[in-house]
Each structure stands twice: as C-alpha cells, then as structure tokens.
C-alpha cells in the first residue's frame, strides 16, 4: 500500500507508534500533541530495523513488517545459528489531529523511506493483556524499501524505545524483548574512531541539507516530491555502497551485529488478524 489518504479534517487519526515516538517527549519535541493515548498490540506485524540510517552513528531505524501466512518468523543474530520466535509488535496508539499527523509524516522523512499502512490494534489492559472487545484501526509507517538483514540500531535509539515501553505499564513486559536486542556500539580503537569520524564528516552535511529540503517541500499530506525522494534514496544508496565496499575494508564496519528476521514453513501457525 502506498500513502494513505488523511481522514476528515474535523476528525482524529489514530497513529501507531513503535519506535522512538514511544517516548512522548520525542513526539512533543516535534511540536505534536496527542489527544488520546492507548497501549496496544498489533498481532499482524512485528518490529524490525530495516530502515537504513547512517553508518558509525545511527545504522538503522525501526519499522514493522507483516507476519507471513502459514510461516513462522524467527530472529537470528549475527553468525549465530540459534534463533528465537518473534513476538507481535506492541506500542502506543496516539490520537492526532490532521495537522499534527501531517507534521509527524514530515518528521519521519516525508514519505521517502516509509509507506503509510493501516493496522488493526488491540488495546492492552494494565497487565499487558489484549482486550478482544477493544480494538482500533490505526495508521502506521512501514518500510518502503526493507533492508535485509537489518543493521543493529544504536544504543541511544534502542534506549528510547525501551524507555518508552517502561514508562507505560502495559508495555513493561514487551520492554524485556527490546532490551534483549543487540545495539550498535561505536568503535573504541583510535584507528576505528578516526575512520568513523572521517566518514561522518563527509556524508552528514549533504544528508542534513536534504532533510531541510524535505521540511520545506511537502504536499498537503506531508509527502515530499518524487524527484527529491529519488535524490535522497540515491545518496543513501551511494553512501552505503561506499561503506560496504571501500570504507569498511579500511576502517572497520559501522553497522554492528546483523539482525536476521527469517520465515520458515510451519505446520501449524496461529492465524493472525
């Protein structure tokens, strides 16, 4: 699904947050005020980190992906053969007015890396259990170009998600899963630090310029022009290609331990709605 149409301008829009927006302060710092907040679970999707970021700083960002029908989704870390089951994603549903929802889409990249999709969410009670009779339909953001395997998110970014869960009682058990995920650790050797610094000094300025261009070139739904999106994707592609094939060979990698979300056939898989 591509971008979704906004609701009636006089009505609210439920937005499902699963990443750094779980911290209400992050949302408020973007000038967005929630009219209502519900802790929810989305049984049809799971949390991923398949949005490309910047090596040596923020290698990846959160997204969601749908569970495949009649298959089991597991997570394997790095080169380890061991895997574990992946739980449905949990987070917060924020009720936003159309203006704030548009601002949120702009703050998340103006539709360059994400598609807007609708999900069915079950509201959680204070013990973190879903209430079958309490559901809502929410908009959320899903990777437009999923990056597999996932790079590890930074400790800073993963910490925002973990703290956001811990600040909301129904999500405290889910925070244990978040805390078990690996985080990217910046290089510690002088050689690797110099390599990371040189990389960021070269690539960050043009990326910041493009982010500013997104904020001033968006339509009524918060999306940037197609030509600008193409430029941004091309620059990120060049940056990661240079990292993988040249820079990392000299200075070491800047994306941490890989997260492999894998789907395997299962004889009996619970139906997810």
Swiss-Prot record:
<keyword id="KW-1133">Transmembrane helix</keyword>
<dbReference type="GO" id="GO:0016020">
    <property type="term" value="C:membrane"/>
</dbReference>
<comment type="pathway">
    <text>Mycotoxin biosynthesis.</text>
</comment>
<protein>
    <recommendedName>
        <fullName>Gamma-glutamyl cyclotransferase gliK</fullName>
        <ecNumber>4.3.2.9</ecNumber>
    </recommendedName>
</protein>
<keyword id="KW-0456">Lyase</keyword>
<dbReference type="GO" id="GO:2001310">
    <property type="term" value="P:gliotoxin biosynthetic process"/>
</dbReference>
<feature type="transmembrane region" description="Helical">
    <location>
        <begin position="227"/>
        <end position="243"/>
    </location>
</feature>
<keyword id="KW-0812">Transmembrane</keyword>
<keyword id="KW-0472">Membrane</keyword>
<dbReference type="GO" id="GO:0043386">
    <property type="term" value="P:mycotoxin biosynthetic process"/>
</dbReference>
<keyword id="KW-0843">Virulence</keyword>
<dbReference type="InterPro" id="IPR017939">
    <property type="entry name" value="G-Glutamylcylcotransferase"/>
</dbReference>
<comment type="function">
    <text>Gamma-glutamyl cyclotransferase-like protein; part of the gene cluster that mediates the biosynthesis of gliotoxin, a member of the epipolythiodioxopiperazine (ETP) class of toxins characterized by a disulfide bridged cyclic dipeptide. The first step in gliotoxin biosynthesis is the condensation of serine and phenylalanine to form the cyclo-L-phenylalanyl-L-serine diketopiperazine (DKP) by the NRPS gliP.</text>
</comment>
<comment type="similarity">
    <text>Belongs to the class-I pyridoxal-phosphate-dependent aminotransferase family.</text>
</comment>
<dbReference type="GO" id="GO:0003839">
    <property type="term" value="F:gamma-glutamylcyclotransferase activity"/>
</dbReference>
